[in-house]
Amino acid sequence: MLIALTGTPGTGKSSVAERLRERGYKVATVVELAEKHGCIIDEEDGEIVIDVESLAARIDFEGIVEGHLSHLLKPDVAIVLRCNPAVLRERLKGRNWSEEKLLENLEAEMLDVILVEALEHASEVYEIDTTEMSLEEVIEAVEAIIRGDREARKRYKPGGIDWLSELEDRIEEFMRKV
């Protein structure tokens, strides 16, 4: 089974994946798999450009794939980690990104971009709001979904997170200026 651990940068994917690996799960990053299968196209502004369609066609991995593109690999299950954009902004500020890149990611989170893409590419999709959860709580939620726990799968079904409604009077703070 291919499980995507995905979400906007800063939602906790790498931290969760690292701990899951320590607990014995088979975990790889999208970049590791892209390197293995020769699917890295280029590098732009310090970011690796991956031929995701080619990787999805070539992937032979069973386990958890971590990365904000992992949901595009046609996984059996996609677990989308989410975070309130107001909190996410603070998490991302330490990355020394340009204001444009910061806002691009906040906008993507606000508009459910990764969730919508996951719904298009994965057989099953779950979303976890990591905003006020400890790392251990997020890991427990992810493990429950992986185990097939019915309560967890019901609790984390997609559609329960709506940043636009929650932050409606602050939307402009998180959107790029046109």
Curated annotation (Swiss-Prot):
Pfam families: AAA_18. The keyword tRNA processing does not apply. Its EC number is 2.7.4.3. Residues 94-104 are annotated as: LID. It is an enzyme of class 2 (transferase). It comes from the Archaea. InterPro entries: Adenyl_kinase_AK6, P-loop_NTPase. It catalyses: AMP + ATP = 2 ADP; ATP + H2O = ADP + phosphate + H(+). Disulfide bonds: none annotated. ATP binds at residues 10, 12-15, 95. GO terms for biological process: ribosomal small subunit biogenesis; rRNA processing. Residues 29-50 are annotated as: NMP. Keywords: ATP-binding, Kinase, Nucleotide-binding, Ribosome biogenesis, rRNA processing, Transferase. GO terms for molecular function: adenylate kinase activity; ATP binding; ATP hydrolysis activity. Broad-specificity nucleoside monophosphate (NMP) kinase that catalyzes the reversible transfer of the terminal phosphate group between nucleoside triphosphates and monophosphates. Also has ATPase activity. Involved in the late maturation steps of the 30S ribosomal particles, specifically 16S rRNA maturation. While NMP activity is not required for ribosome maturation, ATPase activity is. Associates transiently with small ribosomal subunit protein uS11. ATP hydrolysis breaks the interaction with uS11. Belongs to the adenylate kinase family. AK6 subfamily. Interacts with uS11. Not a structural component of 40S pre-ribosomes, but transiently interacts with them by binding to uS11. This is Putative adenylate kinase.
